[in-house]
Amino acid sequence: MKEQIFDIIETISGTDEFREDLDMDLFEEGILDSMRAIMLIVELEGAFDISLPPSEMDREDWNTANKIAARVQEKTDEN
């Protein structure tokens, strides 16, 4: 599952730079911005049949690839 999530992040961001450091702040490094974050949410919801309401997500909860993977795993476990 993690690899699929990382592939989606790579597709949305257009870079695999984050794979070198999965705890890299994706927003600070310019890998994600608000528009790409929304695109990422839409892709993750479709790929994993989960709901990720933006109102439930603080930027600090979604700023690294590891945190994104953990949140998606959490949501899939709820289903």
From Swiss-Prot:
The record's subcellular location field reads: Cytoplasm
- Keyword 4Fe-4S listed: no
Q: Which residues carry this modification: O-(pantetheine 4'-phosphoryl)serine?
A: 34
Tell me what PTMs the record reports for this protein: 4'-phosphopantetheine is transferred from CoA to a specific serine of apo-DCP.
Gene3D superfamilies registered for this protein in UniProt: ACP-like (1.10.1200.10)
A Pfam family that this protein carries is: PP-binding
Alphabetized PROSITE patterns for the sequence: CARRIER
Q: Identify the residues that the record assigns to the Carrier domain, covering every copy.
A: 1-76
Name a GO molecular-function annotation: D-alanyl carrier activity
GO cellular component annotations of the record: cytoplasm
GO BP terms, alphabetized? cell wall organization; lipoteichoic acid biosynthetic process
* Pathway assigned in UniProt: Cell wall biogenesis; lipoteichoic acid biosynthesis
Q: Which family does it belong to?
A: Belongs to the DltC family.
Report the protein's function: Carrier protein involved in the D-alanylation of lipoteichoic acid (LTA). The loading of thioester-linked D-alanine onto DltC is catalyzed by D-alanine--D-alanyl carrier protein ligase DltA. The DltC-carried D-alanyl group is further transferred to cell membrane phosphatidylglycerol (PG) by forming an ester bond, probably catalyzed by DltD. D-alanylation of LTA plays an important role in modulating the properties of the cell wall in Gram-positive bacteria, influencing the net charge of the cell wall.
What is this protein identified as? D-alanyl carrier protein
